[in-house]
């Protein structure tokens, strides 16, 4: 058995076990809150609940003609508090990162560490005036990182799919990740 990263493209349903499992794996890896930099914990924020939110905001993606199939995928989502999500709003990542750094007094290095804790390459979010091609680079990079994490946790190898393989042909059921998490 192997883990096919194309499966991640199909995870868009918030109630699906596999969708939740990927978010849980990112939490388990020690992701930190985008605004405070504090360790993310589903139960520690009380009035500021943790949920899975967009990294490239939905509004930004819609304005740039990116399909919902891509922007609503778990690849473009990560655990964030409600206040972090509100601060991000619909701005491009480079803009909301600057806003968070300014308001919270975070250095770029500290913010980059937060992004890396979410399996995000900071350089891919810091692109000034990002384009669809920049979103695509971010998306493919994060998909590879999430696939590597899922494969490591399950003990499976990451499959390198051929171009003709479709996500519906994936042999491995990501729902099994929930049991491993």
Q: Which ranges hold each PLM region?
A:
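Short, well-ordered coil↔helix boundary/capping segments
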Residues: 68-71, 75, 87, 105, ...
């Amino acid at each position: 058995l192997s883990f096919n990263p194309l499966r991640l493209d199909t995870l868009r349903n918030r109630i699906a076990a596999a969708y939740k499992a990927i978010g849980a794996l990112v939490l388990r890896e020690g992701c930190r809150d985008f605004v405070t930099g504090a360790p993310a914990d589903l139960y520690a924020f009380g009035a500021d609940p943790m949920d899975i939110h967009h990294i490239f905001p939905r509004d930004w993606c819609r304005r740039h003609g990116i399909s919902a199939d891509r922007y609503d995928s778990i690849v473009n989502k990560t655990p964030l508090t409600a206040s972090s999500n509100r601060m991000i709003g619909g701005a491009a990542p480079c803009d909301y990162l600057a806003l968070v750094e300014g308001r919270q007094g975070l250095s770029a290095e500290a913010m980059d560490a937060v992004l890396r804790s979410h399996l995000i390459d900071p350089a891919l979010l810091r692109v000034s005036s990002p384009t669809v091609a920049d979103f695509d680079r971010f998306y493919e990079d994060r998909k590879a990182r999430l696939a590597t994490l899922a494969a490591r946790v399950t003990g499976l190898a990451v499959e390198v799919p051929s171009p003709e393989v479709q996500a519906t042909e994936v042999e491995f059921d990501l729902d099994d990740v929930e049991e491993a998490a």
